[in-house]
Amino acid sequence: MKSVLILAGLVAVALSSAVPKPSTIKSKNVDAVFVEKQKKILSFFQDVSQLNTDDEYYKIGKDYDIEMNMDNYTNKKAVEEFLKMYRTGFMPKNLEFSVFYDKMRDEAIALLDLFYYAKDFETFYKSACFARVHLNQGQFLYAFYIAVIQRPDCHGFVVPAPYEVYPKMFMNMEVLQKIYVTKMQHGLINPEAAAKYGIHKENDYFVYKANYSNAVLYNNEEQRLTYFTEDIGMNAYYYYFHSHLPFWWTSEKYGALKERRGEVYFYFYQQLLARYYFERLTNGLGKIPEFSWYSPIKTGYYPLMLTKFTPFAQRPDYYNLHTEENYERVRFLDTYEKTFVQFLQKDHFEAFGQKIDFHDPKAINFVGNYWQDNADLYGEEVTKDYQRSYEVFARRVLGAAPMPFDKYTFMPSAMDFYQTSLRDPAFYQLYNRIVEYIVEFKQYLKPYTQDKLYFDGVKITDVKVDKLTTFFENFEFDASNSVYFSKEEIKNNHVHELRCATRLNHSPFNVNIEVDSNVASDAVVKMLLAPKYDDNGIPLTLEDNWMKFFELDWFTTKLTAGQNKIIRNSNEFVIFKEDSVPMTEIMKMLDEGKVPFDMSEEFCYMPKRLMLPRGTEGGFPFQLFVFVYPFDNKGKDLAPFESFVLDNNLLASLWIAPLLMHYSRFLTCISRIFSFTTRVNGSLTNSIFLRMTHMIMLFQKIKF
């Protein structure tokens, strides 16, 4: 990377009562062949807990013979392995599937291979029909979801939002109980009484108002953040990330970005934690708590969620992690952490055919792989037992569930599913612990020299930001997959069940950037948000604050000689997406030869409405950093991972570290650093200030 320019401004995020109208769905046109295939894919996600014997997938799947069609797969060995496991006995139907359990995961990978190595779409579809009819529902959905995302001939096809596929993973038992009662009564016996409990009917939909977990049931301060940790868009985002790059995924086998996988892992969690930290700050909670494997963890968690047969395990406050049941796991976790520190102290790592120099910035790939403990860390020649994985063991210990009853039966915890992990405060404490270990590696990197930082002839002269306001709005999603329907109901297009809750959003805003350039050049502009003060109101230094930087946008621009004025609207920020479109609307769009653009091309991005943290009534100060550097597109062949790796340079949080840790040495080579100051409810000259108005709650029972 060559040269970085920085502009730091103080901004304040505000909370407003204004609720703007939803934006128009951005779509793209598709041909008739695409529409036919897309409808076939979507058919697998309807009424997922039961079989529709009248559907095409059932008629094909019940008689499809995989062995007789062996020539229609590009990897016969993988097909033979699947058949061997299938004949031995796959996971029974109706049991809960989790990828964090050995036997269930091995079977799901074998099934994914069957899908992945299908020679053409027709074979892929028939294989999916077979699995939909004969295999466990959750296991099928997991493998099929990833297959659609990863198969080259499925590029552009839409998969439904995870909260429509697995609605029970995105709402608590209170809402489920309302849905079950309504379904069993075949509607609302007494509409007036139902309305008092937040249930009403609109056309062909039953709507259920839902609260987030509150202080009555969730008796520690973490409940203030449930509007964020239980947000269905954020939890779906995490599931998309796993589907994009599963921890068991072998890059050489499936063709993923092997050279930057660990970098992506670190970047994803650093950004997720920074975003979570923003919410902690604006809610007065401060830094993410730390914990010890040998001491009780202060933060309890009560999921109030259900599987088909059991409730989720609960973890009380001050839960003792180091119990007799966990002795072996805790010993492994502690040893794994100490081993990494020993690697750093030696300055290098050498094993599994790898030789890593920790002074090389590219060593971040190994470091990230080490903490994800993924398949690329060891290579194809090493058989990896993921039951002795750091992440798997840590999730098991913190989840506080009892030991599994057998290879398929377990009491789940929120940590057992990617759809629910973000709901547990211990999740953030665990990954903050991992990221802090990775940051220790950063201390071994050399600071940038002047020739690496200086963008010759280019200087940022000014940045202005519109007023920033946040608000809460109503949102509904289709929860029909949480219940069973009769054959007649399925045939006659049954009434849909909608779960309704509030969610965080913000008003659109512009960022105005002025750049003086002596040369015409292709440049990259990055914008990052960072806190100005810690939870005690003490200004944060750049050296100590770089891990809290949250990337807002990345884009290329052509600089001309002279003054360049750049106006960037928040709706253009490329690493965010609009909310997913319901399946019912997707089917209507397909009839018009269209699909939602964001769900087709940018499904794995963070929801656009969550780019800003919840504001406060008086305004909460943040800093905006703007960087400009030359565009380096050499060797960029990273699709479909462009959502994580955007150019040939290291990701923002990686190259910013040695810059900021040593920035005082290089002030002379950085064109300009602005540090605006402002005060709440004031307006100072040349400051970027955003005022807030009072928020009006949409549901009076919900208190944030």
Curated annotation (Swiss-Prot):
Keyword Glycoprotein part of the UniProt annotation: yes
Family: Belongs to the hemocyanin family.
Major subcellular site: secreted
Source organism per UniProt: Bombyx mori (Silk moth)
Protein name: Sex-specific storage-protein 2
Tissue localization of expression: Fat body.
Transmembrane region(s): none
Gene giving rise to this polypeptide: SP2
Cellular component, GO, one term: extracellular region
